[in-house]
Amino acid sequence: MALISVKTILTSLSLFHITLAFFFFTNPETIADQALVYMLGEAMGMPTTTKFNVPSPATSLLAMVLLSVGLSDILSLSMPEEVWLVHHWGSQAPLRFLFFVVVLATTWLGAPSAPRRPGANGIMSRPVAVAGTGSGGGWDGMRNRVVFTLVFVEMLSWFWVWVTLREEARALQDKKRRRNSSGGDRHL
């Protein structure tokens, strides 16, 4: 059995999304100045960006998306346990994990300091990311420390949810099987 239940992890992750939504809407620089963003950015050679210094239409849209995801995820936990544990999150957790793995790989491999990228200054160079000016279109706006850290934390969180979910779903199925087998003996 897991130390922390999947319901607790999902509730915490939903509240994390709602909190991020507040900061992206009101003051995105607060997120960009976090120690975790700095440490992961430095360790992975991700460029800094000035796009999170003031609220913008993009950060406001991100805030609304995070708010809706956080609220819908926390509301999904009010369904019956078997429905959200097995059916809803059983498919959502691996899909979200896979999505964030792809976005993380694209963000890191497409960064100006990524290995094997033409014109890269080296793995540990830290240029300032200028969003939307390169040939990569919208992907260039995602190649920075803030996005990398957010996607990295999301990927780790969804992997944790997925692993814990599988354990708890298996335990729920075993409990259901035992209950059905003991219930059938009483009728004989």
For the regions a language model picked out, list residue spans one by one.
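Alpha-helical transmembrane segments of multi-pass membrane proteins
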Residues: 18-32
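Membrane-interface elements of multi-pass transporters and channels
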Residues: 30, 34, 38, 78-82, ...
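Perimembrane loop-to-helix junctions flanking transmembrane segments
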Residues: 32-52
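Eukaryotic polytopic
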Residues: 3-8, 13-20, 59-62, 66, ...
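Interfacial helix-start motif at the membrane-water boundary
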Residues: 45-67
